[in-house]
Curated annotation (Swiss-Prot):
Chain positions covered by the region annotation Disordered: 1-20
Gene Ontology biological-process annotations: regulation of DNA-templated transcription
UniProt record similarity statement: Belongs to the TACO1 family.
Keyword DNA-binding in record: yes
Molecular function as annotated in GO: DNA binding
Protein name listed in UniProt: Probable transcriptional regulatory protein CPn_0573/CP_0176/CPj0573/CpB0595
Subcellular location: Cytoplasm
Keywords: Cytoplasm, DNA-binding, Transcription, Transcription regulation
Keyword Ion transport: no
Cellular component GO terms, alphabetical: cytosol
Record's compositionally biased regions (Basic residues): 9-20
Amino acid sequence: MAGHSKWANTKHRKERADHKKGKIFSRIIKELISAVKLGGADPKSNARLRMVIQKAKENNIPNENIERNLKKATSAEQKNFEEVTYELYGHGGVGIIVEAMTDNKNRTASDMRIAINKRGGSLVEPGSVLYNFARKGACTVAKSSIDEEVIFSYAIEAGAEDLDTEDEENFLVICAPSELASVKEKLISQGATCSEDRLIYLPLRLVDCDEKDGEANLALIDWLEQIEDVDDVYHNMS
């Protein structure tokens, strides 16, 4: 999620939006496998699995894909997925947070080191970058499903803190993490199509970059986003 960066031009935003669609599919499948590993393959007795299956259907993942991965998740050969967070500083003092979901932390760590060796930056101790960000809930809403003035009114009434534009096709409704489920439910009740709800990081302060550092950071972020296990990359570049 690039945020409001002067470096994120239209072409870059479009490429990232297209790439993000594939990431959503991949993340849901990993969440499904993790839910089965933790609570079993029966959605009737596994509330977490029920929620993930519903999310999969909302994102038009075919039933055969869901069934195939449910079967895959019950295999002893399939490892569980773990959530991992990496903090690093990019060029010009920009903070970057990388969230990944992986079944092999050594592989993911190796991919992170390769990205940094190729594009610069430095991994730092946990907490060194996080304090520059706030944890928020976010709901992606299709612009085609609801008018901007209407969604703003409903979102604020539902408990949202802000309404943003995620890309050309979607709004992004921001709220406190504890309000995410309630906000999503109320928006859906008003006809909005919510394709994804998740927790994100929003920068509390922005770092201004010169052109050289800005372009170098974009190259680093693009590389990080291409890592298979990585789900989201956040930064505080203005």
